[in-house]
């Protein structure tokens, strides 16, 4: 079977994912998942979720490059990319992944700062007298 390519996005992070049938090897930016995320167990679980849900954790190799954003956003982008690649690999996985909300792109991004405000919505302190 050929290599499947997909992209995932979250906030400012973009993940390019290549999925191939194999032995469950994961390389992100040239590092293994444990080297890349260190002690962030929740983020590792988040990345593995689509593969575990479809029982493909031991039978798919994942090669990915991530850029932009922080570790959490990159992990979410990677999860989104893996999910899209799995659905392209086997369309029947859509029925498993769609109800879990993994195919939906999380469109929440940082709200811009407005003039006259301290942050996006925080106003300067108001004094009546």
Curated annotation (Swiss-Prot):
The keyword Protein transport does not apply. HAMAP family: Ribosomal_uS9_B. Keywords: Ribonucleoprotein, Ribosomal protein. Residues 107-129 are annotated as: Disordered. Residues 114-129 have a biased composition (Basic residues). It comes from the Bacteria. This is Small ribosomal subunit protein uS9. Belongs to the universal ribosomal protein uS9 family. It comes from Sulfurovum sp. (strain NBC37-1). One of its GO terms (molecular function) is RNA binding. One of its GO terms (biological process) is translation. One of its GO terms (cellular component) is cytosolic small ribosomal subunit. The gene is rpsI. The lineage of its organism: Bacteria, Pseudomonadati, Campylobacterota, Epsilonproteobacteria, Campylobacterales.
């Amino acid at each position: 079977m050929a290599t499947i390519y997909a992209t995932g996005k979250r906030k400012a992070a973009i993940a390019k994912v290549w999925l191939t049938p194999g032995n469950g090897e994961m390389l992100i930016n040239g590092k293994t998942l444990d080297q890349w995320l260190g002690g962030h167990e929740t983020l590792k679980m988040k990345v593995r979720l689509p593969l575990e849900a479809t029982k493909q954790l031991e039978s798919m190799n994942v090669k990915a490059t991530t850029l932009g954003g922080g570790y959490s956003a990159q992990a979410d982008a990677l999860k989104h990319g893996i999910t899209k690649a799995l659905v392209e690999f086997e369309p029947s996985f859509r029925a498993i992944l769609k109800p879990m909300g993994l195919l939906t792109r999380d469109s929440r991004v940082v709200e811009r700062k407005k003039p006259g405000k301290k942050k996006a919505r925080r106003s300067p302190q108001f004094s009546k007298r």
